């Protein structure tokens, strides 16, 4: 969740959705991350999970080979298998340190800031921040068109790389 107020952007993040700002620098748009994903790969997040008695490891196939990202597990059970370290309402994961507490960040809005993109992990799994900013920039201020373009690129990447497609949500906010 983000709010623009009084010349500042307030970004409140929980989990692996992300907020990215497009800032013009030297005539080009640069992606600036306004939120940090809370995933088990982050040292501070991993430390909290382990301190609370959880385990961090990827899912494994029948041969013991790692599949996918690091996940949060109970110490002795293969559950919940959450690929993020903060979320609402997951009481099993909460018992091993997954918390519903967001990180709140505050940034000054400048005259060089053009737009921000808020999107679910279904977008960020295969597209990096700059790729998404470039896709949105190619839509000349047309928000619905920009969202469709990001969603299509994300969907296409998922179908190339995986047998399933994650949820894909995208919001674009332009600054005057």
Give short role names for the model-derived ranges.
Residues 1-176:
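PP2C/PPM-type serine/threonine phosphatase catalytic core
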């Amino acid at each position: 969740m983000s709010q623009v107020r009084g010349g500042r952007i307030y970004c409140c993040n929980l989990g692996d959705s992300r907020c990215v700002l497009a800032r013009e620098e030297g005539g080009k748009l640069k992606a600036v991350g306004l939120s940090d994903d809370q995933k088990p790969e982050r040292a501070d997040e991993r430390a909290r999970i382990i301190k609370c008695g959880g385990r961090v490891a990827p899912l494994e196939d029948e041969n013991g080979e790692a599949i996918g990202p690091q996940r949060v597990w109970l110490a002795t059970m293969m559950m919940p298998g959450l690929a993020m370290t903060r979320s609402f309402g997951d009481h099993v994961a909460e018992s091993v340190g997954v918390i519903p507490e967001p990180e709140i960040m505050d940034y000054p809005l400048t005259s060089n800031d053009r737009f921000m993109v808020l999107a679910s992990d279904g977008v960020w799994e295969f597209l990096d921040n700059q790729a998404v900013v470039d896709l949105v920039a190619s839509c000349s201020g047309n928000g619905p068109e920009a969202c469709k373009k990001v969603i299509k690129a994300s969907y296409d990447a998922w179908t190339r790389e995986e047998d399933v497609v994650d949820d894909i949500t995208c919001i674009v906010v332009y600054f005057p």
